[in-house]
Amino acid sequence: MLHQIATMPNFKFLEDIAIADAAFEAYGDTLEELFGTCALATFEVMVDTRDVKPEQKEEILIKDLNLDDLLFDFISELVCLKDTHKVFFSKFDLHINKNEEYELRGTVWGEKIDYKKQEVRRDVKAITYHMLEVKEMDNGWRAQVVLDT
């Protein structure tokens, strides 16, 4: 079963972490919700995702040995898709399994970038490993992410 993130994402931007970059802390009850919230926060740096219609979809499959690398590769894939397909994403249905390694399968939806319709805040070039952390808490999951803008 695929999990969709809640309509009100649980993240906050961290202004004092990286001056030239964008940083945020995200939360989720499940890993799927956490990763979806991180994806949404990444695109919120660039655009008001409420203005991005889920008209175009992409399938994603990522495998990694640990959660930090899985999140890094997931966000990297989204940034790459944004750059190559010229799409902002706003909806994320994800499923994460753990066997010998973590596997993220999902569908992401977005809309072609339209500078007349969408006000672009700033461009995200990449996710960084600086202060990157995915951590299980007593009441769910937390991630800290710094993006190169």
Residue spans for each PLM region:
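N-terminal intrinsically disordered, cationic/polar leader segments
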Residues: 5-149
